[in-house]
Curated annotation (Swiss-Prot):
Coiled coil: none annotated. Phosphate binds at R86, G124, T125, R126. GO terms for molecular function: 3'-5'-RNA exonuclease activity; tRNA binding; tRNA nucleotidyltransferase activity. It catalyses: tRNA(n+1) + phosphate = tRNA(n) + a ribonucleoside 5'-diphosphate. This is Ribonuclease PH. Its EC number is 2.7.7.56. The gene is rph.
Length: 238
């Protein structure tokens, strides 16, 4: 039995609240159970110097956690003068995931930054951030479209992410902290709405996992991402 008493293929309750920030062109408060992430999309009519003159835009992300998002206070990275390797890894993952489904030429020579701030952490912060960031990005692009800044909304399809792992010998979907901290294997899957794989991150914490176990995790992830994509679609219609 999972600590949360969920079925092995059952996700936590997921919700999206759009338009939560007054000034951002797009924003979303996403909740995966007790993991809450606030995402703000910011449009800038400028590009990184290395991208100027290439006729395409850019989508990037930044990620951080509030000091009391965790059980014990975590120092703000700004006070240390540098970002941790984990933070850099996660924000690059978010950016890659969103760019994989964005028509950067259709965006034009502009940049959209997704700021992902973890308000409360209970496992799966990066997967929640990616999934909520897609909603915020969609709303930012729709904001531009409504103002005739775009001819069409340059999103190819949905993208979402979910964690899976092996907990007490059993593959399970959407790990919370209690499961993630004791899992023999944990993995993150980023997939598109049509089933394309953007990225897989998997680690054996105790003993190596088999190919069959990997395929079991992949099957769980496909189910979870499919459900998340449907929730995204419902959210943007609301």
């Amino acid at each position: 039995m999972r600590p949360s008493r969920r079925a092995n293929d059952e996700m936590r309750a997921v919700s999206f609240e759009r338009g939560v920030l007054r000034h951002a062109e797009g924003s979303c408060l996403v909740k995966f159970g007790d993991t809450h992430v606030l995402v703000a999309a910011t449009l800038e009519e400028r590009l990184p110097p290395w991208l100027k003159g290439q006729g395409r835009g850019w989508v990037t992300a930044e990620y951080s956690m509030l000091p009391r998002a965790t059980l014990e206070r975590t120092r703000r990275e700004a006070t240390t003068g540098k970002q941790s390797g984990r933070t850099q890894e996660i924000q690059r993952l978010i950016g890659r995931s969103l760019r994989s489904v964005t028509d950067l030429v259709g965006l034009g020579e502009r940049q959209i930054t997704l700021d992902c701030d973890v308000l409360q952490a209970d496992g799966g912060t990066r997967t929640a951030a990616i999934t909520g960031a897609w909603v915020a990005l969609h709303d930012c692009l729709n904001w531009m479209y409504q103002r005739s800044m775009l001819k069409t909304i340059p999103l190819k399809e949905n993208v979402a992410a979910i964690s899976c792992g092996i907990h007490e010998g059993t593959p399970v979907l959407d790990l919370d902290y209690a499961e993630d901290s004791k899992a023999e294997t944990d993995a993150n899957f980023v997939m598109t709405g049509t089933g394309g794989i953007v990225e897989i991150q998997g680690t054996a914490e105790k003993t190596p996992f088999s190919q069959d176990e990997l395929l079991s995790l992949l099957a769980l992830a496909r189910k979870g991402v499919g459900e998340l994509v449907e929730l995204q679609k419902q959210a943007i219609k609301a």
